């Protein structure tokens, strides 16, 4: 399942979306803005943009590949 959304990702909702009793783990990565500077300005947030159709197509390809390569039942 690949979802492109504008709101922040809720890790509990993501886990529940692909929960399977046969699975023994749920692995996520969560990036945060670190205390850093860019060109002498404080970094407070990150903004992302996406070409939605391309992003969704590529995201679905990545998930399909992961499902074929690893012994997993789902990916979000």
Give names to the regions the model predicted.
Residues 1-76:
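N-terminal, polar/charged subdomain of small-to-medium soluble alpha/beta proteins
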């Amino acid at each position: 399942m690949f979802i492109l959304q504008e709101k922040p990702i809720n890790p509990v909702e993501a886990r529940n979306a692909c929960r399977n009793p046969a699975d023994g783990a749920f692995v996520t990565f969560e990036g945060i803005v670190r205390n850093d500077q860019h060109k002498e300005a404080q970094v407070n947030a990150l903004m992302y943009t996406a070409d939605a159709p391309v992003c969704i197509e590529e995201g679905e390809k990545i998930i399909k590949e992961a499902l074929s390569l690893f012994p997993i039942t789902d990916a979000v």
